[in-house]
C-alpha cells in the first residue's frame, strides 16, 4: 500500500437520544470509504434500571446495516415482522433495498435491571444494481 493511500479517520461524538456514539464515517474529508457510509462505535454506555436506548421506527433505503455487540443486548423490530434480539458476538444484517422501517431498543429484561451497551454498527451502500432489492433481515449467532 502506498503512503498516499494511508489516512487517519478521527471520530466525532454524536448524541442519539440518551447515549452517544463515536462516528468515524461520515466525516471530513472522507464522506465514505469504499462502500461504508456510516461507521459507529456505540458506548460503552451504562444504563440505570428503567433506562436504555430507544431508536424509534425509521426508514432506510438502498443500503444494508450490520450490527455487532461487545456488551448488552438490543431488540430489533422491523416492517418485515422480524423481532430479534442481538447479543454479544451475534451479527444482525439488515438489507434495506427498496425500503424497510425498523427500531432498536434495549431489551425489556435489561431495561428493568439496568445494563451496559457497547458495539459497532456500520451502514454499507448496496451496489447500484441491488439498491431496489427486496428488503431482508438475517441474524447470525
Place the predicted regions along the sequence by residue:
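Short, Gly/Pro- and small/polar-rich lid/capping loops
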Residues: 1-11
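A short beta-strand-loop-beta hairpin characteristic of the jelly-roll/cupin
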Residues: 66-88, 101-103
